[in-house]
């Protein structure tokens, strides 16, 4: 019986699952928005939120813990320099999962995972069209 086990296996071995979640976490921290399947998005949220909470306190020990989980120096720098201060006053709930319908090939439920309060990127094509 598997009572009390909240982890989704996602039809992968533990090594594959951990590597996939690490890659997805790096992508989310880099781009601040990614598209994936709904079960993966829900698991990703469980991994990313504690990382951002860790970044709110920029100690050497926390940076080493973050590097141990991310394995990417650039993402650790971004996490502690940008994301930690951005969410300093927010007590959790750093990610948003938006359902996006179903994938064409296999009808898998898709979702958009994004960091809340991310800066809006201005669309230069819309500004150019307005100018004309």
Curated annotation (Swiss-Prot):
GO CC, alphabetical: cytosolic large ribosomal subunit
UniProt-listed HAMAP family: Ribosomal_bL17
Organism for this UniProt entry: Polaromonas sp. (strain JS666 / ATCC BAA-500)
Stated name of the protein: Large ribosomal subunit protein bL17
Pfam families in the record: Ribosomal_L17
Lineage: Bacteria, Pseudomonadati, Pseudomonadota, Betaproteobacteria, Burkholderiales
Family the UniProt entry places it in: Belongs to the bacterial ribosomal protein bL17 family.
Hydrolase among keywords: no
Keywords noted in UniProt: Ribonucleoprotein, Ribosomal protein
